[in-house]
């Protein structure tokens, strides 16, 4: 298989800037008249001329027809890693925060989904970005809502201390309520016949030898058993009990102490330590709400019950994406795929990912670790079934796009170099290859650095 020729970096950068400006100018016309725009014949244009329609012009740029199942996507990439690298990912806002156009109309025709394909527009042959944007909004809202539901339910229970717990359903009609206790007997319609012998209750009386009941013995005076406390013997020196006079003073004149002693005069004791008037529940709810806000801004996956730990993990992942991009290729690839799944929502199966992420925090961490291992295996073996399964969980076509193997001129695996370049954030800068590859004549050795760099998170997900 022949390696696709990669255009010059400066030419790609110029073509992109011109094509993007014209796309923004022609966007209202293309939305109003999509059929006429597609039916117009575009003239043959060279590399230096602006491209009017990327769909019709891309095959004319001396590029073979790409089959996403067997080859890599077209190398029409963002040359400097800037520009569209986070703008308008399938109609969303920056970094897929859903702050942009959420009605399914891409602001830039859905271009540059993950820094790889600039020629994906809203066509009937492709999955509609309207549905994807709706899934995007619903999924991001589901992430936050599930987070809010799980955390806020806990917060309500903590803060309100069961006040918001569902009350027992009581009917307005008291007759519908269940009667408690033994039901009352209805009064008899006829009076009872009490002429017969009464029912004998209690212990039967003792019988004598002949079977007659013995009469109860009459207690004799002096023969009763003495009960209670025995009488205190009188003291000879003490007067009669009945004649004793009670006084509030002792014999020495001091008052008798009875009951609780009076409070000590002087400085009053310090008040009890003031408790938190907000209560632990409301404080927890504030913490959780802050964590929810952080999660919504970061748009990370682990928006789960343990928000504090997840925020720390997600912030560390973002630091890995931004700073440690060189040493964390597989880690960044994992984070980028998962984060782009939730942020960009280019994927169809986002609902499953969101439910898994919302319900199983520990499982998400495990799957992230598995994805890290599988992605590292994919760099070694692009035909890894585990990586295909993981990509199928993210998008239905990930396995078709990332399992392509093409040998670069230097003998390097172009898929591995693409993955590594995407993880390094230099996919557009090196035009799909490592800048350190000495065997690649198209690899640029030096690139103009810009102060407006953005976090680049490729996902390698394409629609057929």
UniProtKB/Swiss-Prot annotation:
Residues 1-112, 125-464 are annotated as: Disordered. One of its GO terms (molecular function) is DNA binding. Residues 1-15, 161-174, 240-253, 433-464 have a biased composition (Polar residues). It comes from Dictyostelium discoideum (Social amoeba). GO terms for cellular component: chromatin; nucleus. It comes from the Eukaryota. This is AAC-rich mRNA clone AAC11 protein. Keywords: DNA-binding, Repeat. Residues 16-65, 78-88, 130-160, 276-428 have a biased composition (Low complexity). Residues 177-189, 198-210, 224-236, 255-267 bind DNA. Several proteins derive from AAC-rich mRNA, which, due to a frameshift also have ACA and CAA codons and thus are Asn-, Thr- or Gln-rich. The keyword Repeat applies. Pfam families: AT_hook. One of its GO terms (biological process) is regulation of DNA-templated transcription.
